Every structure is written in C-alpha cells, then in structure tokens.
Design a protein with these regions (language model features):
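Catalytic core of carbohydrate-active enzymes
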Residues: 1-151, 155-191, 195-216, 220-222
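Short beta-strand elements bearing conserved aromatic residues within extracellular beta-rich modules
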Residues: 144, 265-267
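Exposed aromatic-hydrophobic patches
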Residues: 203-205, 281-287
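Extracellular Ig-like/FN3 beta-sandwich strand-entry sites
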Residues: 211, 262, 290-292
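Short acidic/polar inter-strand loop motif in beta-rich domains
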Residues: 220-226, 302-305
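Pro/Thr/Ser/Gly-rich low-complexity, intrinsically disordered linker/stalk tracts
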Residues: 230-260, 289, 303-316
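Short beta-strand segments within Ig-like beta-sandwich modules, predominantly Fibronectin type-III
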Residues: 272-279
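Beta-strand-rich modules
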Residues: 284-303
Length: 316
C-alpha cells in the first residue's frame, strides 16, 4: 500500500517534533527506521519554532491577507521576523515592504507571546488583520490572557474550529487536530486517521496591525517531550556484535544479538551517531575505500544505554 521506512534522517542538535504526530526526537544524531507511509514526507520542527501560515489554497490569489496565522512550538526564548510585500513587483528593492517581529518566551509553565506592531508599508498592504495563534501543547492551559494595543481582551472558549473562526476573540482546545481534510470523498484514503498532538488555537479580532501590538499569556503550558520510542526498563548488556558479509568498498554491515529490555540500538562511526535502529543489523554507507574504521554498537532503553561494543572494520 505504499508503506515505507526511511533511514538516514539527520537531526541537528536540539529537540525535534514530528509535525504529523507530535512525537519528540533528540537531535545530534541520525535517526533510522522511521515510519513514513506513502502520504507522509518526514517533516521535523525544532522546538522553539515560530511558523507563519496561511489558509489552505491552490493559488496565491486565494490567500486571505486579512488574517494572519502563527503556529508555535514554545521552548525557551524564540524570535522571528515576518516579512511581507506586494508579491507581484520588485518595489521591495526600494523599501516597499513590511516586517513584524514575534517573540516567544517560555519560563517554567508560563508562556508569553508578543507580536509587535508591523513596520513599513507597500502598495495594497492589508493593515486591518485578524490574528490566529496556534500553540502546540500536551494539555489544556490553566489560563489565557490576551491584550491588543495594551488593552485586555476577553477570550471566549468555543468547542469547534468552525466556531473559533466565526467568533472574534475566542479560543479552542483541539485535542486531536486532523490533517486528513482534503482526501477524495469515498476513497480508502479518506478513512486514514492522521492526527497530531493537541493545540490551543486563539482567534483575535481584526485590528490595525501597524498601530496595535498583541500580547498573549498562557499559564499552565505543558508539552510532552519524552522519547516515544523509549518504553522498556532494566539493565542492558553490551551487545555481542560482529561484522556481516564480505568486505565492500563503500559499506560495512554490523550485526548483533537481540538484547532483552532494549528499545533500539545505536551505531557510532566517524563521530556520527546512527540511532533508533530496531533491527539487529545495520549497514553504514558512503564510506571511503581502503579505510579502517572503528564501529561501536550499544543498546538503549528509557533507563539509559549499555556499554559500547567496538568492532574493527575495513573497506576494500
């Protein structure tokens, strides 16, 4: 059915969230055996990201310029500058454009989001805009406070996304946002459930964004950053490992015995950590010919990792 597994996905340092389900992966390693069925291009968002978005469209002419949308993955201090111009001419070269600075601050369980006044202008600029803020969470907040132009705005809780978009100054706790909204009616794919982590969505009334800044405060912010792959507990032994198959010019394959209590295995070579390997063998690719390598293998679970087992390998 087009199901697939992706290997060799490098994640830089930091915490990375699978955009399609909310699972968190630690960076500084290469993840493997990642489930990626035919509909899913692997997309990871670094915690702390501020993402500008627009309404679903098939053409830029369908974008609603009277509504701006920001999706946040709060983590520490984050800043983002939103750039905008007429999208048609080269007048931006002579300064006809606008920018909006957004700042997110998470201290313990208090989140503060500041959207500054938009600076600059261009022909056709829509200054009177509503604002939608989507915050990725694990549970509903304890309290929400919004201000526009320094004045507190009363927020009304609603129970559906449709009600949110038709209600000024409202918020909605979406327990399971559904991505599968555009499948062909009656198709098998329409039945596929594609849900992610909860979101708190806030819809603020239209205001002159060049004159009024926005501040949003959330108390009780929570986001589960535990590794979803780590479930087992208990002591781990260093794997009994060996090289598998004949020597080759560009690859080396290591194999090992299955370890009780192991959730996955890691292989380190040339300072690169290949992680989330759930099978008991792994082929390292893109090596240099006629080169000796130290290959290290260990088992991992939620309690920690085993000692490394070191192998010597050589390409031909």
């Amino acid at each position: 059915q087009g199901n697939d597994i992706r290997n060799g996905i490098y994640l830089p340092e930091g915490e990375w969230v699978d955009y399609f389900n909310g699972k968190v992966y630690q960076g500084g390693r290469i993840i493997n055996e990642f489930d990626a069925p035919y509909w899913k291009l692997p997309v990871f968002v670094k915690r702390g990201a501020i993402i500008p978005m627009v309404n679903p469209n098939n053409n830029v002419s369908q974008i609603d310029n009277t509504n701006r949308i920001f999706e946040l993955y709060p983590y520490g201090e984050s800043d983002y500058s939103l750039y905008d111009d007429d999208g048609k001419t080269e007048l931006y070269r002579i300064g006809e454009h606008a920018t909006t600075h957004i700042h997110s601050s998470l201290v313990k369980d208090r989140l503060t989001v500041n959207i500054d006044k938009t600076e600059g202008n261009f022909a056709g600029q829509e200054k009177n805009q509503s604002t939608e803020i989507r915050i990725n969470v694990s549970q509903a907040p304890k309290k929400l406070v919004a201000k526009m132009g320094g004045k507190t705005v009363k927020l009304t809780e609603v129970s559906t996304m449709e009600a949110l978009r038709s209600t000024e100054n409202a918020w909605f706790y979406d327990k399971a946002p559904q991505f599968n909204r555009f499948a062909t009616k009656g198709s098998d794919f329409e039945k596929v459930d594609i849900t992610k982590n909860p979101m708190v969505c806030i819809h603020l009334a239209k205001t002159d964004v060049t004159a009024n800044a926005i501040e949003l405060r959330m108390d009780g912010y929570q986001f589960d950053n535990s590794d979803a792959l780590l479930k087992s507990a208990g002591a781990l032994n260093a794997p009994q490992a060996s090289l598998k198959g004949a020597n080759k010019a560009f690859t080396i394959t290591a194999a090992w015995d299955k370890q009780a209590n192991a959730d996955y295995y890691e292989v380190k070579i040339d300072g690169m950590l290949h992680s989330t390997i759930r099978s008991t063998e792994f082929t390292i690719e893109n090596l240099k010919p006629e080169t000796e390598y130290d290959i290290q293998v260990r088992a991992v679970n939620k309690d920690g990792a085993s000692e490394w087992t070191t192998l010597k390998g050589r390409t031909i």
